[in-house]
């Protein structure tokens, strides 16, 4: 059995995230991450390969945390499950505000030294696939079709709406207590109104 790691990955990724949020992507050098996390630079290079590897891991961890909450959303009907998925975005931002800020304010292309490589793109596509599949399933269940327009309507309610709300309130400490209820009502209205179209 391997010995436990002396420097926990989450501590390293938290340090990288904090540096990026405080000073932008350039503030998160390997040396700065090493100093902030207490992990030797050699450990960082061994575990992540380079600075881009650390920052990509921090960003993907935030995305994974968001998606875990979104995919866990459940309710009695497809429409209410879609609404719960929208509200999950607000809950994520409330529980993990630094991760939400990282996802909202920093694009991978801005975070990394170059464009995200093929491996990053492949990982991102694989991570997004279940969410996209679920949105398509909602479109079929709610509107009887998974054509582009129906999928877009569901995406507006469960993804675009909470994204815009969280973006507006991401730096509020604390976020307003009424956000979940308002996002639920708004998402429900978008889904219902699209279902009533001629």
Feature annotation, model-predicted:
Residues 11, 15, 19-53, 57:
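Helix-turn-helix
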Residues 12-20, 62, 66, 89, ...:
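Short hydrophobic clusters on alpha-helical segments that form packing/core surfaces
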Residues 26-27, 51, 144-151:
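Short, charged helix-capping/linker segments at alpha-helix termini
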Residues 57, 71-98, 155-158:
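Hydrophobic alpha-helical connector segments
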Residues 67, 102, 111-144, 152-156, ...:
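Amphipathic alpha-helical packing segments from all-alpha helical-bundle domains
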Residues 70-74, 104-111, 142, 165, ...:
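Secondary-structure edge/capping motif, primarily at the C-terminal ends of alpha-helices
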Residues 95, 137, 141, 155-177, ...:
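Amphipathic C-terminal alpha-helical segment
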